């Protein structure tokens, strides 16, 4: 079987949809976080606040631009899925990069907000940290699948081709045609966040996967320092 067949031996569109749905939910969670942290975090009495410049609502403009860009890309991605367009991976790559940048920017906005306001409700901070963790998990779940799965398919047909991620040999030896599924990538994503590194017996091989894990671990570390620590300090002060 040639390389071309292996390259296109990817999950069907309804199987792709699980990972694409995860990627699509992430910016929606980020928008929810933005609304919570920017509208309520700076107000001890719960009044709505705005970030404005010369009368213009910059928060609303930011949310509108991000939402519009991601919605347009999502519509295009759905169209390519329905018509099985050959550029589907290119569209997913663009959407994945933008969603990741949106996640990182949102974490920076959270950090800026909690460092510049004197009083923040501890419950709100814990909620924001949980939502940010969920958004991060969904985003990097997509990246691990997007980068690794094609290499797993190539390795299935050509044993000399290296995989981007080496999964535990016990799972591979059980079935000569074993391929990782959603649960395998979800486990890898969650454990990488929880331990700030790859889980036991999971080895990142490709440079792309190593870069993804570094970005993921750094983002989680920032969340721990900026959000959780501030929430714990607020609880002690109450």
Summary of predicted features, one role per range:
Residues 1-12:
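Short, Lys/Arg-rich, polar N-terminal cytosolic tail immediately upstream
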Residues 115-150:
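Pore-domain transmembrane helices of cation channels
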Residues 149-203:
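Membrane-proximal soluble regions of multi-pass membrane proteins
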Residues 180-238:
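Pore domain of cation channels
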Residues 23-43:
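Alpha-helical transmembrane segments of multi-pass membrane proteins
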Residues 41-58:
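Perimembrane loop-to-helix junctions flanking transmembrane segments
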Residues 65-122:
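Cytosolic-side membrane-entry/anchor segment at the start of a transmembrane helix
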């Amino acid at each position: 079987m040639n390389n071309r067949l292996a390259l296109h031996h990817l999950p069907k569109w309804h199987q792709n949809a699980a990972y694409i749905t995860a990627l699509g939910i992430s910016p929606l969670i980020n928008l929810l976080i933005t609304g919570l942290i920017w509208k309520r975090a700076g107000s001890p009495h719960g009044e709505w606040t705005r970030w404005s410049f010369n009368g213009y609502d910059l928060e609303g403009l930011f949310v509108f631009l991000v939402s519009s860009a991601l919605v347009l890309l999502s519509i295009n991605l759905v169209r390519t899925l329905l018509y099985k367009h050959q550029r589907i991976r290119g569209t997913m790559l663009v959407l994945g990069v933008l969603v990741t940048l949106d996640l990182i920017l949102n974490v920076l906005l959270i950090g800026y907000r909690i460092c510049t306001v004197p009083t923040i409700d501890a419950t709100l901070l814990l909620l924001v940290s949980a939502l940010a963790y969920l958004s991060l998990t969904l985003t990097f779940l997509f990246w691990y699948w997007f980068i690794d799965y094609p290499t797993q398919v190539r390795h299935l047909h050509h044993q000399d081709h290296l995989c981007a991620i080496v999964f535990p040999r016990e799972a591979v030896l059980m079935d000569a045609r074993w391929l990782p599924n959603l649960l395998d990538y979800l486990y890898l994503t969650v454990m990488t966040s929880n331990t700030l590194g790859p889980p036991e017996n999971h080895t990142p091989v490709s440079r792309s996967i190593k870069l993804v894990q570094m970005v993921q671990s750094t983002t989680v570390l920032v969340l721990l320092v900026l959000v959780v620590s501030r929430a714990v300090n607020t609880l002690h002060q109450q």
